[in-house]
From Swiss-Prot:
This is 3-hydroxyacyl-[acyl-carrier-protein] dehydratase FabZ. It is found in: Cytoplasm. Belongs to the thioester dehydratase family. FabZ subfamily. GO terms for cellular component: cytoplasm; membrane. One of its GO terms (molecular function) is (3R)-hydroxyacyl-[acyl-carrier-protein] dehydratase activity. It catalyses: a (3R)-hydroxyacyl-[ACP] = a (2E)-enoyl-[ACP] + H2O. One of its GO terms (biological process) is fatty acid biosynthetic process.
Length: 145
């Protein structure tokens, strides 16, 4: 299990764009399960939508991508690198995510060859499918400008 400080030591995302609160399970380089506690205070609810707050689907996908980044960047060989979101296939949204929901984020790395790879992401709330997708990634190094 990884807490928020440990997650922040692995991926560079920070508020308001850090969308993973905890990693519950992790198998290095293979898979992870994380959670996002969706609060009524999330900044995106101010505009999406004020009278009917719903978490934007693209942010659910981003939360899955961040869990995938933890899987990839936790390994010693990838420490300090960045995982870039390189593509998405077969994305489907099945249920809305609202304030008070706990989003369970499961990502399995399907293949990784060099700096390029693909993972499968599944997001659920209370055991019900919210989103499933395939995510492509590219690993890169931080540039010193």
């Amino acid at each position: 299990m990884l807490d928020i400080q440990q997650i922040q030591s692995i991926i560079p995302h920070r508020y308001p764009f850090l969308l993973v609160d905890r990693i519950l399970e992790i198998e290095e380089g293979k898979r992870a399960v994380g959670i996002k506690n969706v609060s009524a205070n999330e900044s995106f609810f101010a505009g999406h939508f004020p009278e009917y707050p719903v978490m934007p689907g693209v942010l659910i996908v981003e939360a899955l991508a961040q869990v995938g980044a933890v899987v990839l960047l936790q390994s010693e060989e990838n420490r300090g690198r960045l995982a870039f979101f390189a593509g998405i296939d077969n994305c489907r949204f099945k249920k809305q995510v609202k304030p008070g929901d706990q989003l369970r984020l499961e990502v399995e790395i399907l293949r990784a060859r060099g700096a390029i790879g693909k993972g499968k992401g599944i997001a659920t709330v209370d055991g019900e499918l919210v989103c499933e997708t395939e995510l492509m990634f590219a690993l890169g190094d931080k540039r010193a400008d």
